UniProtKB/Swiss-Prot annotation:
Membrane topology note: Peripheral membrane protein
Bias kind Low complexity: ranges: 41-52, 620-631
Modifications the protein undergoes after translation, according to the UniProt entry: Phosphorylation at Ser-58 decreases MTMR2 localization to endocytic vesicular structures.
Official protein name in the record: Phosphatidylinositol-3,5-bisphosphate 3-phosphatase MTMR2
Domain comment quoted from the record: The coiled-coil domain mediates homodimerization. Also mediates interaction with SBF1/MTMR5 and SBF2/MTMR13. The GRAM domain mediates binding to phosphatidylinositol 4-phosphate, phosphatidylinositol 5-phosphate, phosphatidylinositol 3,5-biphosphate and phosphatidylinositol 3,4,5-trisphosphate.
Ranges in coiled-coil conformation: 593-627
Assembly information from the UniProt record: Homodimer (via coiled-coil domain). Heterotetramer consisting of one MTMR2 dimer and one SBF2/MTMR13 dimer; specifically in peripheral nerves stabilizes SBF2/MTMR13 at the membranes and increases MTMR2 catalytic activity towards phosphatidylinositol 3,5-bisphosphate and to a lesser extent towards phosphatidylinositol 3-phosphate. Heterodimer with SBF1/MTMR5; acts as an adapter for the phosphatase MTMR2 to regulate MTMR2 catalytic activity and subcellular location. Heterodimer with MTMR12.
Protein EC: 3.1.3.95
Lineage: Eukaryota, Metazoa, Chordata, Craniata, Vertebrata
Organism: Mus musculus (Mouse)
Cited InterPro entries: GRAM, Myotubularin, Myotubularin-like_Pase_dom, PH-like_dom_sf, Prot-tyrosine_phosphatase-like, Tyr_Pase_AS, Tyr_Pase_cat, Tyr_Pase_dom
Keyword Ribosomal protein in annotation: no
GRAM domain span: 68-139
Length: 643
């Protein structure tokens, strides 16, 4: 069943949550915004003013001063719009790597924050509430044994966080209730934190992607393709963007008849066009052929028009992402696939990529073997049993086949799965990443995500479950995570071809869940417009593009005209340790890669300056020599001057 209303309560159900009061800190988290202004809370100011006279007045006030300072040290530095909701002292975090540690647990409107002053340096755990999948109580009031009474939070980013409370302290109930309230605001009729976040960045990331500019970059419109506004009010297809690129000889009225034959009205539309051959990548959903094998003359004519727009080939490939058995099964639900008898000069290829439920189960198995401990003796067999890398291989291999048909075969391709918003997005975006060097730049990749994932209706709200306590929802699936994993695999095989680094990819995934930014909220462009996200929330790209040096690959060399052909075999794929096992301190490199990147970037900039200086010097010498050679008077002048 479709869940079209799952975005309606993200930000407009209640009056906006209050901004930080004088009782809360209003400074920026160093993990998100190092340049924000830090301000003291009223409590900190008042404690300082009390302590001014305390030194000469009362031992009790000195104790109060020290207690206030300790409390201030234990509190998190808050983001603009963030405020503290609950705090519990004398809580024990059961760290699976370094053992139990006692400290203060704080719940804010944005994060779960634990800090212990018992270790040097202090132990800090900082997790956004958006990353929490579920919260469970452990033990009862009569539970015996140390640390047997508390809470466990299961997270979407592989982690499980376990906290022990003292039964007599009665803090567990309060923390549990506040976590359930603020980690799942949609389920409680509250706005997501993205609607409260008030940070201002130099660049507005919401303006990064302009579809007209992106299509113009590709040479669209041209004699074969046009931009239509038929979906301006999202009436043709409510999960497609307002602007669509379609064959120039197909009128808008005919598009409506094609839409009636495609699942959810998702007609074939252009994603990318080859600058030389004019071969295209188009995307859509499955045809509604059903068990009876229905046909649509308009749909057949439409695909013929796509093929005819490419004079280099008299054939078109239809890549169906599904296993063939699944595609056949979809006929019973009214769906199905294109018959080669009905579609002249079309070849149908099944790519055997499994559905969202298989992928969700695969990630669950992966989590079991990587967190909290890794069983060394059976590591390879355990990893194989998850089938995670096998799924990554099939996605990469499918995208590679698409890119190869377009580049080497100079043939246009049509890509779809069932509804065209999960596996289709994986395949088109990865193929475009292989074909077009622009998408391998930082801003180009952001445009790719905005275009192929966000504007074309990948259901982020349902797949991630932003602010929703229903952790067992069958619509949840790591589709976008798999795409980013595939991108990382490509960066490993082509380390100089991408302008962005690993930290860039991890940052995107962290904020896929965090609900700090509005970028990944809602299920479609239409829903984001209704929620007015560009006005009410901050874009993730605003944050990233304000500090590009953090996300830049120092090894990058511009290969804009190169097509990448990654090897999609199990021998060349590896588990992304930097993401899936990053919480294990034993897996961290001794030298932080992030700081090493910055050093290399600084060194590269220094060397580039020297190269430019030498080039200018050579140019000046060359100019001077040519002038002396061409002018006899100038040749004599130095001699006369010497005399």
């Amino acid at each position: 069943m479709e869940k079209s209303s799952s975005c309606e309560s993200l930000g407009a159900q209640l009056p906006a949550a209050r901004l930080p009061s004088e009782d809360s800190l209003s400074s920026a988290s160093t993990s998100h915004s190092e340049n924000s202004v830090h301000t003291k809370s009223a409590s900190a100011i008042s404690s300082d003013s009390i302590s001014t006279s305390a030194d000469n007045f009362s031992p009790d006030l000195r104790v109060l001063r020290e207690a206030n300072k300790l409390a201030e040290m234990e509190e998190p530095a808050l983001l603009p719009g963030e405020n503290i909701k609950d705090m519990a002292k004398d809580v024990t975090y059961i760290c699976p790597f370094t053992g139990a540690v006692r400290g203060t647990l704080t719940v804010t409107s944005y994060r779960l924050y634990f800090k212990s002053m018992e270790r040097d340096p202090p132990f800090v755990l900082d997790a956004s509430l958006g990353v929490i999948s579920r919260v469970e109580k452990i033990g009862g009031a009569s539970s015996r044994g140390e640390n047997s009474y508390g809470l466990e939070t299961v997270c979407k980013d592989i982690r499980n966080l376990r906290f022990a409370h003292k039964p007599e302290g009665r803090t567990r109930r309060s923390i549990f209730e506040n976590l359930m309230k603020y980690a799942f605001p949609v389920s409680n009729g509250l706005p997501l934190f993205a609607f409260e976040y008030k940070e201002v960045f130099p660049e507005n990331g919401w303006k990064l992607y302009d579809p007209l500019l992106e299509y113009r970059r590709q040479g669209i419109p041209n004699e074969s393709w046009r931009i239509t506004k038929i979906n301006e009010r999202y009436e043709l297809c409510d999960t497609y963007p307002a602007l669509l690129v379609v064959p120039a000889n197909i009128p808008d009225e005919e598009l409506k008849r094609v839409a009636s034959f495609r699942s959810r009205g998702r007609i074939p539309v252009l994603s990318w066009i080859h600058p030389e051959s004019q071969a295209t990548v188009t995307r859509c959903s499955q045809p509604m052929v059903g068990v009876s094998g229905k046909r649509s003359k308009e749909d057949e004519k439409y695909l013929q028009a796509i093929m005819d727009s490419n004079a280099q080939s008299h054939k078109i490939f239809i890549f169906d992402a599904r296993p063939s058995v699944n595609a056949v099964a979809n006929k019973a639900k009214g769906g199905g696939y294109e018959s080669e008898d009905a579609y002249q000069n079309a070849e149908l290829v099944f790519l055997d990529i499994h559905n969202i439920h298989v992928m969700r189960e695969s990630l669950r198995k992966l989590k079991e073997i990587v967190y909290p401990t890794i069983e060394e003796t059976h590591w390879l067999s355990n990893l194989e049993s998850t089938h995670w890398l096998e799924h990554i291989k099939l996605i990469l291999a499918g995208a590679l086949r698409i890119a190869d048909k377009v580049e080497s075969g100079k043939t246009s391709v049509v890509v779809h799965c069932s509804d065209g918003w999960d596996r289709t997005a994986q395949l088109t975006s990865l193929a475009m990443l292989m074909l077009d060097g622009y998408y391998r730049t930082i801003r180009g990749f952001e445009v790719l995500v905005e275009k192929e994932w966000l504007s074309f209706g990948h259901r982020f709200q349902l797949r991630v479950g932003h602010g929703d306590k229903n952790h067992a929802d069958a619509d949840r699936s790591p589709v976008f995570l798999q795409f980013i994993d595939c991108v990382w695999q490509m960066t490993r095989q082509f380390p100089t071809a991408f302008e962005f680094n690993e930290y860039f990819l991890i940052t995107i995934l962290d904020h896929l869940y965090s609900c700090l930014f509005g970028t990944f909220l809602c299920n479609s462009e239409q829903q984001r417009g209704k929620e007015n996200l560009p006005k009410k929330t901050v874009s993730l790209w605003s944050y990233i593009n304000s500090q590009l040096e953090d996300f830049t690959n120092p090894l990058y060399g511009s290969y804009s005209n190169h097509v990448l052909y990654p090897v999609a075999s199990m021998r060349h794929l590896e588990l992304w340790v930097g993401y899936y096992i990053r919480w294990n301190p034993r897996m961290k490199p001794q030298e932080p890669i992030h700081s090493r990147y910055k050093e290399l970037l600084a060194k590269r900039a220094e060397l580039q300056r020297k190269v430019e200086e030498l080039q200018r010097e050579i140019s000046n010498r060359s100019t001077s020599s040519s002038e002396r050679a061409s002018s006899p008077a100038q040749c004599v002048t130095p001699v006369q001057t010497v005399v």
